Amino acid sequence: EKMKEVMSNFFVESFVGNTSTHYYSGVELRTATCDQTDVAEVGFVGRTLLNAFNALEYGEQQRRTDLVTNAYKIFDSYLQNGFSETGFFNEVVHYRRNFVESVHSIRRQSEGVYALLHFLNYERLQGRKHPEWEKRIKSMLDMFLRLQNKDGSFPRKFKDDFSIVDKSGGSTPSATLPLVMGYKYFKDKRYLASAKHTVEYLEKELISKSDYFSSTLDANCEDKEASLYASTAAYYLALATKGAERAHYAGLAREAAYFALSWYYTWDVPFAPGQMLGDLGLKTRGWGNVSVENNHIDVFIFDFADVLNWLAKEYNEKRFSDFSQVIS
């Protein structure tokens, strides 16, 4: 709890409230100064909407009205000013440079919808309703159905008119999560059918070939996050299905998890004398690498620890939960 309290200071010091969409600053951050930057990003590195949900939930638990107030300001500002003409998120906005990135990614769009469905479900449980947000998110999920290819994949990048910029399907599993969540929240079976179709693609093109690629956005190559997302996508469908279907998805989650774990360090990398991280005593065991292009450690984990703990129980395979503890 003490560590959460310390980390919650991020929500205070990074909050930017003088732009058309309020956000938590963190993209392009200079670690020497931690000064606020002009970049508002919905998913990927910025994760502004998921951070807002985390700040709201934690703020209410701790009776921190400052965190709660700012979280609602972010959600309200994005509802009013955070969408493109077609209705996708303006996923990256550069305020001082005065431009919005015109190319959308299924990764950031999916992570934005994922965050909003967490927010809406939490608010529903508290007896609070947000019909305008529900309308927006349902519209986005419907656009996902339109964007999905016949083979079940989603294009990695696209424009506001649905024209394709990067047809690679490696980012597909990022869409599976909000589709399953949308099915649960809106009780719309089309979203579940779409989610199942994504995993048909994943099984055929990624999991069966052990070829996981193009999920991260700072490179376009084989990467950790494609396997991590594939495992998590299959896990979500296992939770949403029963019987033989559930068992099949669980098996896919396990197979992809084995590959994802190969990206995580099982040892502490030695540093040369004088290197800052070595001098600070950084231990790399449990940290993940990123991709074959970006060879550095990375904090990305999110749902995957839950997936590992679930797999440990599902298959009585304790090494999954053991390594989840190492990562945590």
Predicted regions and their residues:
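Solvent-exposed loop and edge beta-strand segments that line ligand/cofactor-binding
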Residues: 30-48, 95-111, 156-174, 211-232, ...
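Extracellular/surface-associated beta-sandwich interaction domains
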Residues: 1-12, 47-56, 240
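Aromatic- and glycine-enriched glycan-recognition loops and surfaces
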Residues: 33-38, 43-85, 98-110, 123-142, ...
